[in-house]
């Protein structure tokens, strides 16, 4: 058993899986020195033969209906044992292709662990997969939170632009539909932020606190926007003189501090 792992490739050719090892096919190491020598033994090998010399960490990539365990590989028991439950690797590959990156990593870690952690290489790979799943998950959470924050900020800027314009008694004059678009733009961004927040999965404790704070800010902004939408609806239904009088009822306030 090698002390170091290396990568190889798999390809589906005309509906059949084959494996290729460019590393071993390119030469060999002897006495600490690499000798370049082409070896076609490791070119386009069927999975049943390849498993004799190559054991993937994740048994899915054995591409066998009766995958062998790590202990069986150690013991040289590489023949297909059809008394085992059949593993539909083709179906599992389809599932794998449709999984998120995090789910792929978690499923792979589960298979690695199930197949026996019997040496340091396997242990390190399992540790890597679990850490990578956790890191990728957290990166997704942070990315989504930042995306929601950006949408919220855009909404607040648009809202405050509208309020500033309203407090100037809608001067210089714009068409009603253009004024409506100003508040709709703010509402759209706040709603976008709310939708993104709802999609954030399994955040850690510190990020959850930030999410709750942002959610409250979004709810407050939504209430203010609804109030302005109602005011604008009344404004549009009035005549010129009546519209002007609405600006003297009370001055509208800017809202919120955009998130950094």
Predicted feature locations:
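Extended hydrophobic/Leu-rich segments
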Residues: 7, 51, 60, 73-74, ...
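Intrinsically disordered, low-complexity regions enriched in Ser/Pro/Gly/Gln/His and often acidic
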Residues: 10-12, 224
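Charged, long alpha-helical assembly modules
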Residues: 137-260
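His-Asp-centered catalytic microenvironments across diverse enzyme cores
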Residues: 2-5, 12, 16-132
């Amino acid at each position: 058993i090698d002390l170091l792992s290396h990568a190889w490739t798999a390809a589906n050719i005309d509906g059949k899986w084959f494996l290729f090892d460019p590393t071993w096919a390119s030469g060999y190491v002897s006495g600490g020195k690499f000798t370049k020598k082409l070896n076609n033994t490791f070119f386009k090998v069927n999975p049943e033969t390849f498993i004799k010399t190559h054991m993937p960490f994740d048994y899915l990539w054995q591409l066998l209906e009766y995958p062998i365990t790590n202990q069986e590989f150690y013991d040289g028991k590489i023949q297909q044992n059809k008394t085992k439950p059949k593993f539909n690797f083709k179906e599992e590959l389809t599932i794998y292709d449709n999984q998120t990156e995090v789910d792929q990593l978690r499923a792979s870690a589960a298979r690695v662990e199930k197949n026996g952690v019997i040496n340091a290489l396997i242990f390190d790979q399992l540790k890597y997969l679990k850490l990578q799943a956790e890191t990728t998950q957290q990166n997704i959470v942070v990315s989504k939170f930042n995306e929601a924050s950006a949408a919220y900020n855009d909404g607040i800027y648009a809202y405050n632009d509208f309020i500033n314009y309203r407090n100037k008694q809608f001067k210089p004059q714009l068409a009603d539909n253009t004024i409506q678009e100003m508040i709709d733009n703010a509402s759209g961004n706040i709603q976008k932020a709310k939708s993104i927040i709802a999609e954030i999965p399994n955040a850690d404790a510190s990020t959850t606190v930030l999410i709750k704070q942002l959610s409250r800010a979004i709810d407050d902004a939504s209430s203010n926007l609804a109030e302005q939408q109602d005011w604008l609806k009344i404004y549009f239904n009035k005549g010129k003189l009546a519209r002007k009088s609405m600006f003297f009822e009370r001055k509208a306030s800017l809202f919120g501090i955009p998130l950094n």
